[in-house]
C-alpha cells in the first residue's frame, strides 16, 4: 500500500507539473522604411498602432502609417479548427478556438479567416444573429471586409439566413463592382443562393440561374476557383428544380471534368 501511495503521489506531482497548453500568440515581422523586426505582435486599435515584443523581451511601438508591411505567422490551431467546422465534428471546441483567434488576431491578417469560419460554425448551430455579430466586429475595424475577403462570404450567408435582404443586396452589388474577381464571383453565387432561399419554385430557380450561377459559369470560368465549382453544382440543382434534367446533367459533367478535386464535385 505504501508503495502504491508513493507511486500515486509521484503521478499527481507529474500531472501538476505539466505546463498548460499555450494558446496561439500572434507572431510575425513588421517592416518599415528603416528596416524590419520580428516577434510577438498585437494591434492597439484605440491608438492605431502595432506593439512588437522581440526575443529579448524588448517592446517597440509602430504607428500604422509608418508600417510598410506586416507579415503574420499562420496560427497553429487554425487549420484544425477549420476542419472541425467543415466536418461538423467537435464544433463547440472549434468555435471556442475560433473565438479566441478572432479576438487575439484582431487586425493581424487571420482575424478575417478565423471570423469567417466562426460565423459558419454559428450558422451550423442555427445562430445567424451570432454569426452576423461576429462578422460585424471585424467589419467595424475594416469596412471592406463586408464585401471582400475571408469574412464576406460567411457574412452574406448569415444575412441570407436572417432574412436581411436589403443589406445583403447592397453588399453584393459592392462586391460585384469592386473589380475583385474572387469577390464578384462569390457575390454572384450568393445572389443565386438568396433566390433559392425563398423556396424551390420555378421563378426562384430561374432567378438564381439568371442573376447568379450562370453568370459565374459564363463570366468567371476558372476551374481553380471554388466559386466556379460551386456555381456549377448549384446551377445543376436549380435546373433540377425546374425539371430540366439534361441541363442539370450537363453542368454536373462539366463540374466533374473541370474541377475533379473540388469538394463540390463529390457533393450529392
Region roles according to the model:
Residues 1-8:
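Bacterial N-terminal signal peptides that target proteins for export
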Residues 55-62, 102-111, 140-150, 174-187, ...:
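Short solvent-exposed coil/turn linkers within tandem alpha-helical repeat scaffolds
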Residues 21-141, 153, 157, 161, ...:
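Compositionally biased alpha-helical segments
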Residues 166-215, 225:
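Flexible, glycine-rich surface segments
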Residues 17-19:
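N-terminal signal peptide c-region/cleavage motif recognized by signal peptidases
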Amino acid at each position: 500500500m505504501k508503495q502504491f501511495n508513493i507511486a500515486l503521489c509521484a503521478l499527481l506531482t507529474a500531472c501538476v507539473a505539466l505546463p498548460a497548453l499555450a494558446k496561439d500568440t500572434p507572431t510575425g515581422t513588421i517592416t518599415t522604411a528603416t528596416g524590419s523586426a520580428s516577434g510577438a505582435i498585437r494591434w492597439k486599435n484605440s491608438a492605431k498602432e502595432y506593439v512588437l515584443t522581440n526575443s529579448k523581451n524588448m517592446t517597440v511601438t509602430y504607428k500604422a502609417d509608418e508600417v510598410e508591411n506586416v507579415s503574420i505567422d499562420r496560427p497553429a490551431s487554425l487549420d484544425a479548427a477549420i476542419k472541425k467546422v467543415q466536418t461538423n465534428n467537435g464544433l463547440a471546441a472549434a468555435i471556442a478556438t475560433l473565438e479566441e483567434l478572432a479576438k487575439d488576431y484582431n487586425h493581424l491578417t487571420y482575424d478575417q479567416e478565423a471570423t469567417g469560419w466562426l460565423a459558419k460554425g454559428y450558422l451550423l448551430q442555427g445562430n445567424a444573429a451570432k454569426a452576423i455579430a461576429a462578422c460585424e466586429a471585424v467589419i467595424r475595424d475594416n469596412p471592406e471586409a463586408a464585401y471582400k475577403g475571408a469574412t464576406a462570404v460567411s457574412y452574406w450567408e448569415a444575412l441570407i439566413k436572417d432574412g436581411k435582404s436589403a443589406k445583403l443586396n447592397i453588399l453584393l452589388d459592392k462586391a460585384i463592382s469592386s473589380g475583385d474577381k474572387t469577390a464578384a464571383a462569390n457575390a454572384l453565387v450568393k445572389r443565386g443562393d438568396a433566390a433559392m432561399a425563398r423556396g424551390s419554385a420555378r421563378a426562384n430557380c430561374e432567378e438564381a440561374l439568371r442573376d447568379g450561377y450562370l453568370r459565374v459559369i459564363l463570366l468567371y470560368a476558372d476551374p481553380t476557383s471554388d466559386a466556379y465549382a460551386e456555381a456549377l453544382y448549384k446551377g445543376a440543382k436549380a435546373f433540377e428544380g425546374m425539371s430540366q434534367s439534361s441541363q442539370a446533367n450537363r453542368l454536373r459533367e462539366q463540374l466533374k471534368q473541370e474541377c475533379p478535386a473540388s469538394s463540390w464535385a463529390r457533393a450529392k
